[in-house]
Regions:
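Short acidic/glycine-enriched loop/turn segments that link adjacent beta-strands
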Residues: 37-41, 61-63, 104-107
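A short acidic/small-residue loop/turn micro-motif
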Residues: 60, 124-128
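Core segments of cupin and vicinal oxygen chelate
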Residues: 9-51
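Vicinal oxygen chelate
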Residues: 12-16, 67-118, 123
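Short amphipathic alpha-helical segments
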Residues: 4-8, 63-67
Length: 129
């Protein structure tokens, strides 16, 4: 059996602007970028096993992305998982990132990137309040 590895693409207006947001405010790293005519057109960002591609190659799709990112912890207790989401919220808000609470049958943290793509951090083991 082989493993699959997904790299979802988020369509953005300006890859450089998006890179600054994902790296400086969300804590991702960027291992590579593709440049054309002196500007970044596609780039990858990574954080804690999550890999996303940022691309400005399909303008009509800009801002229409929705990505669920599960927050997994080694010690799988409701308290540990809730604490992980709380810590993430504190980290992001300290960097000036607006974070919204949500629910889809379980607790969510929702972050909009500069183009309106949504990153939904979830803890599916925690019931919604």
């Amino acid at each position: 059996m082989t493993d699959w590895f997904a790299r979802p693409v988020l369509h953005v207006r300006d890859v450089e602007v998006s890179l600054r947001f994902y790296v400086n405010r969300l804590g991702f790293t960027s291992p590579w970028r593709y440049e054309q005519d002196g500007r970044a057109r596609v780039a990858q960002v990574d954080r804690q096993g999550c890999t996303l591609i940022l691309a400005d190659t399909w303008p009509e799709k800009v801002g229409k992305g929705l990505i669920f990112i599960s927050v997994n912890v080694e010690q799988e207790t409701r308290e540990a998982e809730s604490a992980a989401l709380d810590a993430l919220r504190t980290e992001l808000e300290a960097k000036g990132v607006p974070v919204k609470e949500g629910s889809w049958g379980y607790r969510l943290l929702v972050v909009d990137d500069p183009d309106g793509n949504q990153l939904v951090f979830n803890d599916p083991a925690e019931p919604a309040s």
